[in-house]
C-alpha cells in the first residue's frame, strides 16, 4: 500500500475493480502524501480533502452496487484555472484570491460524471502567463526531481503534483506550451488537443484563440484516460466544435494489440531543421535525436520538413496573446468581482489601484504590451500584421503534413532551470519557442519523456499531429513507451514514502 502512488491509472482501475484496495484507501494514501510532502513542492493552492473522502466513500458504495464506470473512484486534481462550484478558484492571482466560483467548468462537470475524485486545485503561473510557475501569488512551485529547479509553466502545479506522486493525473491548460513544457521539465506525458476539442466554458481566459485544456500523466495511457471524459461539443462554448468522439483508451489498446516488431512501419516522422538550431541545449538535442533513432529502429521513416522560423513564430505569439489578454482581463476592475483596493478616492482610482495591486508584474507587462498593440496607430502595424503571419504559420504546417504523419521536435530548448535563474522576461519567453506554433495553428501536440540530463533532470520530445489526430499522437507515444522506460522513472519526491 505504501507505493500506490507509483501505479499507473490502468493499474489503479484494475486494483479498484479487483478490490485490492478501496477508493477511500487510495484517496487517503494520496492525501497523506500531499500533507506530508507538498510543503517541499507547493503544488496545491486549495485542498478539498474532506469532500474527496466523502466522494471516495460514495464511489466505493456505487461500485458495490454495480457501477462499472472505469474511472470511478480514481483521484485527480484540477489546475486552478478551471471554475469549480463552491471552491476557491484563483488562477494563481491576488486578483481572485477570494473568488468562490458559483458554477463548474464543463470539464469539471464531465470529469465528475466519470466518477473521478478531485483532491483540490493546483498552483499555476498567474493567469497562465509564465513558463516557470514563479509568477503565482501563492508562491513558486518546485520541481519534484530537484526542488531547486522550476517545474515549468504555466501548469507547473499540475506537472509537479503528478511527478511527486500526489495524484495520478491532472488537468492543465495550454496557450503556448503550458502543458507540454512542464510535462517535459517534470518527466511526464502531457497533451494539448486540437483547438475546439475540449470546452473552454469555465476556463478563465488568457488568450481565447489559443487556450485549450488538456491532460497530464506519467504515460500516454494515463493522458488518454483523463482526456476521454474531457472531450466533446459544448454549446456554451462558441469555439467548441462538433466532431467524431474517439475512444482514446481503446485506440491505444488496439494499436498495441496490432503492433509487431516494427510498430512504426509506415509512419513518417517529420523533423524540421528549424527545431534543431541555435539555443538548443546539447544534452536536450542528444536525447531528442536518440529518441528519433529509436523510432527509426522501430520502423518509422524520418523525413525532413520545413516550418516557419520559430523566432518569427515567437514574435507573432507575443504580439497576439498579450493583445487578447488585455481584452480578456479588462473584466477584472474591482467592481463586479475580484480584488478591490481599499478606500479609493474616486472611480478612476478604484480601477487603477485595484488592477495595479491585484495583478502581478508579468500579467501587467502583458496587458500593457497587448494594449499597445491594439491602440490606434499601431493596430495595423502590429496586430493585423501578426494575424497575417499566423496564416503563413498555418500554411507551413499544412505543407509539412503533406509529407509526414507527425512532426517531432524537442519540447523545450533546455531542461528545467533553477528557481530565480530566468528573471529576464525575454529569456523566459524563448522557453516556448518550440511549442507556440502549435497553438497559433490550433493543432494537437504532446510531450513525452525521452531521457535525463547528466544532472538527472527530465527531457521531453514533442510530437505534433494533424487536426483531430489526438489518437495518433497518443498511440505513437504509447507504442514508444512499450519499448522504452523513460516514463517509468520516478522523481526524488515520488520515491519518498510517508
Swiss-Prot record:
Q: What is this protein's record name?
A: Glutamyl-tRNA(Gln) amidotransferase subunit A
Q: Which GO terms describe its molecular function?
A: ATP binding; glutaminyl-tRNA synthase (glutamine-hydrolyzing) activity
State any GO BP term from the record: translation
Question: What NCBIfam families is this protein classified in?
Answer: gatA
Q: Which UniProt keywords apply?
A: ATP-binding, Ligase, Nucleotide-binding, Protein biosynthesis
Q: Quick one: a GO cellular component term?
A: glutamyl-tRNA(Gln) amidotransferase complex
- The enzyme's first-digit EC class, named in words, is ligase
Biological function: Allows the formation of correctly charged Gln-tRNA(Gln) through the transamidation of misacylated Glu-tRNA(Gln) in organisms which lack glutaminyl-tRNA synthetase. The reaction takes place in the presence of glutamine and ATP through an activated gamma-phospho-Glu-tRNA(Gln).
Q: What reactions does this protein catalyze?
A: L-glutamyl-tRNA(Gln) + L-glutamine + ATP + H2O = L-glutaminyl-tRNA(Gln) + L-glutamate + ADP + phosphate + H(+)
Q: How does it assemble?
A: Heterotrimer of A, B and C subunits.
In short, the EC number is 6.3.5.7
Q: What Pfam families has UniProt attached to this entry?
A: Amidase
Question: PANTHER family this protein is in?
Answer: GLUTAMYL-TRNA(GLN) AMIDOTRANSFERASE SUBUNIT A (PTHR11895:SF151), TRANSAMIDASE (PTHR11895)
